[in-house]
Amino acid sequence: MKRTVIMMLDSFGVGAAGDAAKFGDLGSDTFGHIAKACAEGKADIGREGPLTLPNLARLGLAHAAMESTGAFAPGFADDVELIGAYGHAQELSSGKDTPSGHWEMAGVPVLFDWGYFSEHQNSFPKELTDKILARAGLDGFLGNCHASGTTILEELGEEHMRSGKPIFYTSADSVFQIACHEGTFGLENLYRLCEIAREELEPYNIGRVIARPFDGTGPNDFARTGNRKDYSLEPPAKTVLDKLKAAGGEVVSVGKIADIYAYCGITKKVKANGLEALFDATLAEVKSAGENTIVFTNFVDFDSHYGHRRDVAGYAKGLEYFDSRLPEMLSLLDEDDLLILTADHGCDPTWQGTDHTREYVPVLAYGAGLKAGSLGRRNSFADIGQSIASYFKLEPMEYGESFI
């Protein structure tokens, strides 16, 4: 039976990419810097000691990172019995954002330039916001700036609740984010507002509109809820997900995968929030998956909870939890199944600012007759999509080189 499981550790980079300097990210290293902080006793909040990832290490994580950076991360060495094939991949796409990374790993790199709102204050054109407000029947909005999603709630959450004005903000990514309180503004109202924004943003070539619902009573307890929703553009070409679906296969989205691909190529969507629930849902879908199925999960917490918030200890704890559950996944796989663990970009929690970092991503592959050992440096994330196409005997993708 042929099945593929893709476990996408959102933002888990393994060292500055070859073109990192163009992005201001030379020297970034999500995995390496987390390991270093743990080894130095600087990540002992909620956990303690060196970063411990025995199962990821057996799959080749430390070796992939060593080939990327030239040295083993602190606490890791060439002393494990490898069971997986490992490599590290350079992003071909023009950006270091979520859609670019995901689309490229499915065989469709983003070779055009996204639109961005580059001004840190007064970020959005008045013509754009006027149209959104008019269509939504609103008399104003808050924000209009680059911001951390948690900080802006502390600063503007109460005013939003009093005034009913939505919070519009952006970042270094090609994104338009809208934060609204679920109780006072309403979740469905937020979703409708995002749909309007998605339509009005078409001329600006913005990759995503993101609904950022939150709850709480004040700055001390405002918190995002699990009802985030991404409104992405469609990929510019057919991904390997589309091709498997067209061939009669199944593509199961766990978490925000369906949103990122604008539902293209998806046959089933499973909602789950948090590392534990996402892992549980992935296991459940693998248990029930039949022939010619992809189960594709985005573990978003690594990015949203730990990377952007620059929470080194939280990131380390999350990785150790993820690692502790990998044996459950491995025990479910048949000999012919293919397991791939990778990332869509970096988000080094020790780096300046709060944005993504341009890094190599790990490519860890297990099963399907693959021999344990190095896959080397891959020239594109699209090698993953090409390998999946080869595995399922689909029409080859335009980009990427198969390692199967």
UniProtKB/Swiss-Prot annotation:
Protein's UniProt keywords contain Manganese: yes
Chief location of this protein within or outside the cell: cytoplasm
Residues reported to bind Mn(2+) 2: D303, H308, H356
UniProt keyword terms in alphabetical order: Cytoplasm, Isomerase, Manganese, Metal-binding
Reactions this protein catalyses: 2-deoxy-alpha-D-ribose 1-phosphate = 2-deoxy-D-ribose 5-phosphate; alpha-D-ribose 1-phosphate = D-ribose 5-phosphate
Keyword Isomerase tagged: yes
EC number(s) given by UniProt: 5.4.2.7
Note accompanying the cofactor annotation: Binds 2 manganese ions.
Pathway the protein acts in: Carbohydrate degradation; 2-deoxy-D-ribose 1-phosphate degradation; D-glyceraldehyde 3-phosphate and acetaldehyde from 2-deoxy-alpha-D-ribose 1-phosphate: step 1/2
Source domain of life: Bacteria
Binding site for Mn(2+) 1: D10, D344, H345
One of the protein's GO biological processes: 2-deoxyribose 1-phosphate catabolic process
Any one annotated GO CC term: cytosol
Single Gene Ontology MF annotation: phosphopentomutase activity
Cell compartments where the protein resides: Cytoplasm
Main enzyme class: isomerase
Cofactor list: Mn(2+)
Database matches in HAMAP family: Phosphopentomut
Function summary: Isomerase that catalyzes the conversion of deoxy-ribose 1-phosphate (dRib-1-P) and ribose 1-phosphate (Rib-1-P) to deoxy-ribose 5-phosphate (dRib-5-P) and ribose 5-phosphate (Rib-5-P), respectively.
Sequence similarity: Belongs to the phosphopentomutase family.
PANTHER family found in the cross-reference section: PHOSPHOPENTOMUTASE
Protein name in UniProt: Phosphopentomutase
Organism in which the protein naturally occurs: Shewanella sp. (strain MR-7)
Organism lineage: Bacteria, Pseudomonadati, Pseudomonadota, Gammaproteobacteria, Alteromonadales
